[in-house]
Amino acid sequence: MTRAVHYRDRNAFLQDQVPGSFWISGPEEKGEQSFIFFCPCGCGDKSVLKIGNGFKPKHGPSWCWNGSTAAAELAPSVNWQGHWHGWLQAGVWRSC
């Protein structure tokens, strides 16, 4: 298990590179946002997910976010193909 630490400051987020940490962009026209995170395994890799606050965007791979930064949750699970697969629930990354 890895705690999902939210960063408001994008530059600090990119500099610190804390495993499992995340930064969320402001909403676009359709309400979609970018959820950028460092891999919970600690490898230092970074990825971007398309999310919606309370909804799953319709086009392309996307996730429904619960709107919380303190106890963030994403659905469905996050599958970083060939690398890491798990859930973000109650602010904690849990590997499958």
Model-derived features with residue positions:
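A short Gly-Trp-Pro
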Residues: 2-38, 46-96
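Polyanion-binding surface elements
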Residues: 42
